[in-house]
Every structure is written in C-alpha cells, then in structure tokens.
Amino acid sequence: AAIVTVAGAAVTYSMIDRATVLAAFGIGLSIWLLLSTLTELAERIQLFQAPFAESWRRFLRQPRASWGMTLAHGGLAIAVAGMTASSAWTVESIQTMRPGETVSISGYKFTLRQVRQVQGPNYQARRATFDVTKGTNTSLTLEPEKRVFTVSQQQTTEAAIHSTFLGDLYAVVGDPDGKGGFITRLYFNPLVPWLWVGAFMMVLGAIISLSDRRHRVGAPSVRRSPDPDTVKTKA
C-alpha cells in the first residue's frame, strides 16, 4: 500500500500542471487511507489466504463495528481527495463576453446565448443564459442573475451551479461594459461532491459502529437477592 501511495502521489504531481507538493501529499494520503482500509478488510476476511467460500463467510459475518470502521475510513479518504482537489485545482476564468461568444475551461465550453432583463416578485434582474457542452454530450443550461431589489435597492449576485460527480460548474454574470458585452466569471471546482459523500460515509460509519451492542456502555445490571421463603424451603 505504501509503494502504491508514493507512486500515486508522484504520478499526480507529474501529470497536473498546477499541482503543488501539498496537493500531491493530499492525494497520496487519500490513496494510502483507502488502500489501508481495503487491505485491513482483506486481512480480516483472509482474502487470498483461505478458500473463497471461507472468505465469503467471514465477509458476511463481519460485526457492525468492523463495517462502521471500514466505511468511516473510506469516507475520510474520499473527503481528503475532494478537499485537496477543490483547494488546489479550481479553474477560474474572468472575461467580458458578448452573446454568441464561447469560453472553454477544463474541457467545458460556455456559450453566452443571451442576456435579458427579468422581473421577479420584489426585484429586477439581469439574467444571462449559458449553454454548456463537453465533447459531444448534450448541452446543459446555466442562468445566473444580477438582482436589484425594488425597495432597498440592494444588489445581489446569484450564481448558477451545476454539480457532477467530478466537480461543480459555476457561472456568474456581472455588469455591462457599455459596448454590448458583460463581465462573466466561470468556474470549475473539481471533486466538491466528494466532500459531501465522504462526510456522509463517516457519519454513517459512526452510526453503524455505535449500533454494535458490544460497544454500548450501559448501567450495570442489578442482581436480585434470593427470596427468603425460597431459601428456607430449600433448607
């Protein structure tokens, strides 16, 4: 596991332009956690050491505390990977775009279809419509807004977000440049969903572990004194 961890960190560092030593360490740590967790489970069920039927029997008979620990450690590995990727490899693009123009980031193409004024219940908004494609996949639509509330005249920026298993896409529209264009901000934040998946796995693993009766701490049971009449009868 240690050799694979070091190799994984080295490959990650060499393949990604923006990688740093800290990011490579984070990915290596997540790989080490995951491999160690799987190796420990394999040892408990004697995988490749006993006949498959015996390993399968041990697999099915693992206590809840064991499954909870495995799930929690696996969740920690996933969360560390998500935290590292989202911190080190976020891609941001800020530019002025006109309707019909396209900007590419991280393999995604953002095409600004239109910008129009819309009326909300208590605000007016400038709404941009982006068509997003990747390769030959069907496009999706992101519609960020810049809102101005009627009474308070307060302005807010409403980002449009699309989540995938590999990361989140963000689109933000800003002020016009006076020449038919609008300031836009486009982001790709990788592996953000892994943070939530990892956190959920850790919480679920803790709950499963605590459900194991062997790990419950309860009040000592009270032993009943023998009935005096019964003692006399036996005597």
Name each model-derived stretch.
Residues 1-235:
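Solvent-exposed, non-transmembrane regions of integral membrane proteins
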